[in-house]
Design a protein with these regions (language model features):
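Hydrophobic alpha-helical bundle segments that form small-molecule/ligand-binding pockets
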Residues: 103
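N-terminal helix-turn-helix DNA-binding core of bacterial DNA-binding proteins
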Residues: 2-41, 63-77, 81
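Recognition helix of helix-turn-helix DNA-binding domains
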Residues: 44
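Alpha-helical residues within the helix-turn-helix
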Residues: 36, 47, 53-54
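C-terminal structural segments of small proteins and small subunits
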Residues: 72-100
Length: 103
């Protein structure tokens, strides 16, 4: 497996999924603006954004005195590649099983 584990771990949390979906759908935002939109504190949002950043799911950019976060779905490519490979392996196994049962 590629290093998709941090992505899976980051997206396992519903708050982080909501943050990633928000940034993906509506574009960049600061932790302060996200705190006004979501029912959690700015400090909690900052911690969640740090996990998403470590997983490569968001990018940080200074915007004056604030840090702006934007979705960076590149890390999802590794996960997609891994899932496609695992899916193909299972399709092959199930095909062999189907042929064995039919024979």
């Amino acid at each position: 497996m590629t290093d998709a584990q941090p992505v899976f771990a980051a997206l396992a949390d519903p708050t982080r999924r909501a943050l990633f979906e928000r940034l993906s759908a509506q574009g960049p935002a600061s932790a302060s603006s996200l705190a006004r939109e979501l029912p959690i504190t700015r400090q909690a949002i900052s911690k969640h954004l740090a996990v998403l950043d470590d997983a490569g799911l968001v990018e940080r950019r200074s915007a004056g005195r604030e840090v702006e976060y934007r979705a960076s779905p590149r890390a999802l490519g590794e996960v997609t590649t891994w899932m496609e490979r695992v899916g193909a392996d299972w399709e092959e196994r199930l095909g062999k099983l189907r042929r064995a049962v039919e024979d």
